[in-house]
Amino acid sequence: MKIGILSDTHDDIDNTNKAIDIFQENDVKAVIHAGDIISPPVITEFYRLTEKGVKLFGIFGNNDGEKRGLKNAFEIVGGELLGDVGKIELDGLKFCIYHGQDLKKKEKIIKSRKFDVFVFGHTHTKYPKGVDTEIINDTIVLNPGTAHSVAKTKTSNFLDFIIFSFFL
C-alpha cells in the first residue's frame, strides 16, 4: 500500500495540490497530514483523492487554531482528523502521527515501541537528512518536511515500505 505523507502546508493550496497530483500519479491509497494545515480550504483540496476512495488522516499542529473548521472540513471530504496525536493502522502497520512540538513527548512515543511508523512535522525539515527513514527502537521515524512556499525546500513523502521523497 502506498501512503502519501505531508506536513506543515500552512495554507499553501498550490503546493498542497502539487503533492496531491504526485499522490494521484503514484496511486496512493491513504494520505497522512502531520499538522499545521492552518485553515479548512486546504483540506477541501483533498476531495480529489477521497472521492476515489483514498483514506485521509490528519492531526492538529501548533498553528492550527481553527480546530472546529478543520474538523468539519475533514468530515466533508470523508477524512478523519484525529486530534493532537493520531493512532491508525494501515496495511497491518501501526502508525503514530504527532506534530512534534513537544520533544519529550515525541521521544516517549518513539521509545514506547508501540508503533511501526512514527510520523511527525513541525521542524519544516525533512528527517532524517540525507536518507528517507531512520529506525529507532524498531520504529520507522520520518518527517516529510514542509509543503509551504515560504520554505527554501518544499518536500513530501510517500511510503510503500520503501520511502520515496519528492520536491514540490
PLM feature segments, named:
Residues 30, 95, 116-117:
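Short, Asp-centered acidic motifs that coordinate Mg2+ and/or phosphate
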Residues 33, 89-90, 135, 163:
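Generic beta-strand structural signal
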Residues 64-113, 148-151:
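Active-site-proximal segments of metal-dependent phosphoesterases and phosphodiesterases across multiple
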